């Protein structure tokens, strides 16, 4: 069973709202208030509301059950695909049933020098295991447990760091501080069980009541979770109408039932929806789509000889603006997306690709949430997992299992359901899919796309070795299918009448190499095939058919959207590209340094204008002029220019280091003396504290 965090009310709540008469004339409904932990007197520790995942969906919650760490072991060897160890637990474990135990695992691999290095996502965070492990207990001493963990794919020299955990209790009764309830408001309530009842016959009752201005209490919710409803790992939703408005209202929440089961009952952050003032200009919706691993030069709108993206060409490039020269900051999923969501270069983050709860960097979802947007995300897990910090700011963060055969299909279907459920609200929707990612799987209907004969024609000079051309063909087929998936989603946006009121952004986190510079995949190089990403934008005030050639970065997406929405800027390193849109003119500012990095020994690089520098500790520096050599095949031999570019890189690195140090120091200051030791143990168990 998983324990993480977030919101699943959109479909149920949206249908309830429509059924109750919330028609299109209420198109300016916004989130007027979120009743977070502080409204209920709860200590949030690091400053952000706790997030709890039930099943595939995570939501911010008022109070989460603490995770008790019963045992913590490091250096457990893996032999023949199996890790096994025995530990003596405390006396409280004697009476705990087997299904009350949880297991969290972290992989660590040792290199010859003896240093520990990260091994995939599980090296960054503990990963709670839902299966592939067993707990053995002798009848005469149930507190002495043996754990077996299946690790058939573990790399050589990998050991495990393991925690045996149990879920503690959440508060059973909560009462909010007074708040104002606007006329015609609606409450969105989410509730669920952090784990199924230990007793199959167990049940929990959830009750919500509202008391306003001294009037009699109004019961908003009185539901029991038992049987199949209690065993199902999912959130439950309600959208009650609170009745009369009030100047001073209190929301009272209660969970009751068997002692153990009631302790696992949790409430998502309640939200109050109300109409936006009529005299305030309406805010636009935002849809942000990330097609993981999509390099820009494989889209036909970017000049690729194959028609890989005819639908996006027509629906986005022709109806909006295409940014020709955009780069990521780190060609890996987590760091690239974190730059997208924070507007910060990868080198400025204390841990690239990971946002701790106390690090004072604002995410796009947090900025839009604070502006009254309903926020939802549908991802395909893996390196975009919520535990890395991506779920902060989202009212709903859904992680679908990464299944190659269904990549994209479920994600865009979820996105379409979100649109239908929230068409009368201001929303921010983030969709992420690995559809284009290796192993480049596409449906049989696309088998005839990407003719191998193209390698003797339009693709002859692409620099791809013959042994990699079949991979490129498969990659292009996956892009072509992703193109149709995006188009079907955009058609639903049109059908619902939302297209003219919604900014749509399609981009990626990084590209993909096919041997052009001796590398395959991504993450381990700084050449354009890994860094150059698409950026397509359409919506109000965005010129149709526009093209912007000014070099830009993935960090510019956040400030651009806030600028277009008329929202105040946040402290980010990116800059708004709105000036390149209005009047279809280019940004007039002087070229700015655009730093980036990749996996390598002191690997770092910088783009300044058309000049690009790649530097590592174990290789001579490489200097290119992308204006005359876009494929980076002719390194420049120009000592003066190299010295200048090294100075630019040093300046960019100093700026990143200053921000990184400030963020880390602020995070430590916010952390220190705030969270109790038990909270810190829970954060360690969830992977937030190493």
Positions of predicted regions on the chain:
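Short, flexible helical or helix-coil boundary motifs
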Residues: 14, 109-112, 656, 690
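Intrinsically disordered and other compositionally biased segments
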Residues: 6, 17, 297-299
């Amino acid at each position: 069973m998983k324990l993480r965090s977030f919101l699943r009310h959109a479909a149920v709540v949206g249908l309830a709202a429509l059924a109750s008469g919330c028609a299109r004339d209420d198109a300016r409904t916004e989130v007027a208030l979120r009743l977070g932990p502080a409204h209920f007197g709860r200590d949030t520790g690091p400053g952000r509301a706790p997030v709890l995942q039930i099943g595939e969906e995570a939501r911010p919650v008022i109070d989460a059950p603490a995770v008790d760490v019963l045992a913590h072991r490091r250096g457990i060897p893996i032999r023949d695909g199996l890790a096994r160890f025995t530990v003596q637990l405390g006396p409280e474990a004697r009476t705990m049933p087997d299904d009350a135990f949880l297991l969290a695992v972290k992989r660590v691999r040792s290199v010859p020098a003896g240093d520990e290095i990260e091994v995939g996502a599980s090296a960054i965070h503990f990963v709670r295991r839902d299966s592939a492990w067993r707990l053995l207990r002798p009848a005469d001493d149930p507190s002495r447990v043996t754990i077996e963990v299946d690790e058939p794919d573990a790399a050589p020299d990998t050991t495990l760091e393991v925690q045996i955990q149990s879920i503690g209790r959440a508060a059973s009764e909560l009462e909010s501080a007074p708040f104002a309830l606007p006329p015609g408001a609606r409450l969105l309530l989410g509730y669920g069980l952090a784990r199924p009842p230990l007793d199959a016959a167990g049940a929990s009752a959830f009750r919500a009541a509202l008391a306003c201005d001294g009037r009699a209490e109004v019961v908003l919710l009185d539901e029991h979770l038992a049987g199949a409803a209690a065993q199902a790992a999912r959130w439950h939703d309600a959208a009650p109408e609170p009745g009369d408005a009030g100047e001073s209202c209190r929301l009272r929440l209660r969970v009751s039932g068997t002692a153990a089961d009631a302790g696992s009952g949790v409430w998502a952050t309640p939200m109050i929806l109300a109409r936006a003032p009529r005299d305030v200009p309406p805010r636009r919706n935002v849809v942000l789509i990330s097609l993981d691993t999509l390099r820009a030069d494989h889209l036909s709108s970017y000049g690729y000889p194959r028609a890989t993206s005819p639908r996006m060409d027509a629906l986005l490039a022709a109806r909006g603006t295409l940014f020709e020269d955009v780069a990521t900051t780190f060609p890996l999923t987590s760091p690239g997306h974190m730059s997208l969501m924070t507007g910060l270069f990868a080198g400025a983050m204390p841990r690239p690709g990971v946002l701790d709860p106390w690090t004072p960097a604002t995410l796009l979802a947090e900025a839009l949430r604070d502006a009254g947007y309903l926020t939802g995300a549908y991802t395909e897990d893996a390196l975009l997992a919520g535990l890395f910090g991506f779920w902060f700011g989202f009212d709903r963060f859904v992680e679908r299992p990464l299944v190659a055969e269904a990549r994209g299909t479920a994600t865009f279907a979820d996105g379409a359901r979100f649109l239908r459920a929230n068409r009368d609200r201001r929303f921010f929707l983030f969709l992420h899919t690995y559809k284009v990612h290796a192993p480049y799987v596409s449906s049989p209907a696309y088998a005839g796309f990407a003719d191998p004969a193209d390698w003797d024609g339009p693709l002859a000079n692409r620099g791809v070795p013959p042994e990699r051309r079949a991979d490129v063909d498969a990659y292009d087929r996956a892009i072509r299918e992703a193109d149709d998936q995006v188009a079907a989603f955009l058609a639903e946006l049109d059908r619902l009448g939302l297209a003219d009121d919604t900014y749509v952004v399609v981009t990626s986190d990084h590209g993909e190499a096919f041997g052009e510079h001796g590398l395959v995949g991504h993450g381990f190089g700084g050449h354009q095939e890994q860094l150059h990403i698409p950026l397509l934008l359409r919506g109000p005030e965005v010129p149709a058919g526009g093209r912007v050639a000014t070099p830009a970065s993935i960090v510019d997406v956040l400030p651009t959207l806030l600028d277009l929405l008329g929202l105040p800027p946040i402290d980010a390193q990116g800059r708004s590209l709105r000036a390149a849109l209005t009047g279809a003119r280019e940004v007039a500012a002087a070229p700015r340094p655009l730093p980036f990095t990749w996996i390598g020994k002191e690997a770092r690089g910088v783009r300044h204008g058309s000049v690009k520098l790649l530097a590592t500790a174990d290789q001579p520096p490489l200097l290119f002029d992308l204006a005359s050599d876009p494929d980076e095949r002719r390194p420049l031999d120009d000592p003066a220019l190299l010295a200048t570019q090294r100075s630019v890189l040093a300046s960019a690195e100093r700026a990143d280091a200053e921000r990184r140090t400030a963020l880390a120091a602020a995070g430590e200051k916010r952390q220190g003396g705030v969270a109790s030791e038990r909270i810190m143990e829970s954060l360690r168990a969830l992977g937030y504290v190493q």
